[in-house]
């Protein structure tokens, strides 16, 4: 293959990939490439520009490759540009988005980490990963983290960076495993979350935990679980706030208007998680839907969603935000226009930085040690 064709092919490859930084992915596997394009695109811009290596003007193929590479670099950098326009861009923190951190990363403090068995489900041990600061003065407020995975997969060990970051700030973070569908159907995972909280409450003395100051944090399926737990008629004691990363909160809506099966077979997943269709288990669908169950005593809530999420529609958070506003419940809805599902997987990417900043501020407000709930920068309180 000639040099011109190599340049043209290289530029075309990166240009097609970069389109996923601005357009929705049509399939599940392309969503994975979209996640990389939107949250690691600033890393991909440089190899895209290799088409401008000396000699690019010698052939038509080289010139075409250079143009495509330049266009790809611009699109790969667009998520950072959009994030900076929305949240500002700083050279050092604390700030929502710090430019050097995109490439250099952030210092994550050393913390104490241990694995504890808190219960058994379906004959299996259920463990939690407990993160605590190396040195603690007094009892620590607790963040209970519930992983995603369509209720059928995932692990407490996923995405540990935020847990370590929060532990370094003086929180105890317990990331839990829970029984997975289809063996463990709703409300099984919510009951597992309760068991984890009860276990920590029983061990609060020797683990130096303040179980009167608890925040529930869930991602995707875990977001649904923590919202359902908070909306239950018998909520977990001591919960002062909920953080929901891109979780569904209206299971009837998720069934009635499913997403593209090329992306996610949501009806199959719901049927395996709830135990069947809404016509078979109407009460379970209602109990699993925080939108339908939330009342005036629902805890303060931070909802985070990517504006172009292909797996869980942002309308879930918009409707819950309106519901909480009608109930007078303090809440905040943070929508990231460029971001897709799982955007915080890149801890140092634009989504990871901004959401970490917002989560830390939210925890300070609801657990103490920070200004009242009203947001200060930018104002997203509803």
Per-region residue spans from a language model:
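Short beta-strand/loop motif that positions the catalytic acidic residue
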Residues: 297, 303-305, 309
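N-terminal cap/lid segment of alpha/beta-hydrolase-fold proteins
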Residues: 21-46, 89-138
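Gly/Ser-rich "nucleophile elbow"/oxyanion-hole loop immediately N-terminal to the catalytic nucleophile
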Residues: 201-216
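Hydrolase active-site cap/lid region
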Residues: 83-107, 227-283, 346
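Short amphipathic alpha-helix adjacent to the substrate-entry channel of hydrolases
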Residues: 157-174
């Amino acid at each position: 293959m000639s040099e011109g064709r190599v340049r043209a092919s290289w530029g075309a490859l990166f240009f097609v990939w970069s389109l996923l930084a601005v357009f929705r992915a049509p399939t599940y596997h392309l969503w994975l490439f979209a996640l990389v394009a939107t949250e690691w695109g600033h890393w991909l811009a440089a190899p895209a520009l290799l088409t401008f290596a000396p000699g690019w003007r010698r052939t038509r193929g080289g010139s075409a490759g250079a143009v495509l590479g330049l266009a790809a670099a611009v699109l790969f950098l667009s998520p950072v540009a959009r994030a900076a326009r929305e949240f500002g861009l700083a050279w050092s923190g604390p700030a929502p988005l710090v430019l050097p951190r995109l490439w250099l990363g952030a210092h994550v403090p050393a913390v104490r980490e241990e694995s504890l068995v808190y219960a058994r489900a379906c004959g299996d041990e259920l463990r939690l990963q407990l993160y605590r600061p190396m040195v603690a003065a007094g009892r620590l407020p607790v963040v209970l983290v519930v992983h995603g995975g369509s209720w059928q997969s995932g692990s407490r060990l996923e995405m540990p960076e935020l847990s370590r970051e929060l532990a370094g700030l003086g929180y105890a973070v317990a990331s839990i495993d829970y029984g997975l569908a289809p063996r463990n159907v709703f409300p099984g995972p919510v009951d597992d979350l309760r068991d984890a909280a009860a276990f920590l409450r029983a061990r609060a003395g020797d683990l130096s935990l303040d179980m009167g100051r608890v925040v529930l944090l869930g991602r995707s399926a875990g977001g649904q679980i923590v919202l359902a737990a908070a909306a239950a008629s018998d909520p977990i004691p001591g919960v002062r706030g909920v953080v929901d990363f891109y979780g569904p909160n209206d299971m009837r809506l998720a069934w009635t208007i499913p997403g593209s099966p090329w992306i996610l077979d949501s009806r199959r997943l719901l049927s395996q998680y709830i135990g069947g269709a809404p016509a078979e288990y109407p009460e379970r669908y209602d109990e699993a839907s925080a939108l339908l169950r939330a009342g005036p005593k629902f805890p303060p809530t931070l909802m985070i969603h990517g504006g172009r999420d292909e797996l869980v529609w942002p309308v879930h958070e918009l409707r819950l935000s309106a519901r909480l506003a009608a109930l007078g419940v303090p809440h905040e809805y943070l929508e990231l226009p460029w971001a897709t599902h799982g955007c915080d997987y890149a801890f140092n990417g634009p989504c990871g930085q901004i959401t970490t900043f917002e989560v830390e501020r939210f925890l300070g407000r609801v657990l103490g040690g920070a200004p009242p709930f009203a947001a200060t920068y930018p104002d997203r309180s509803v």
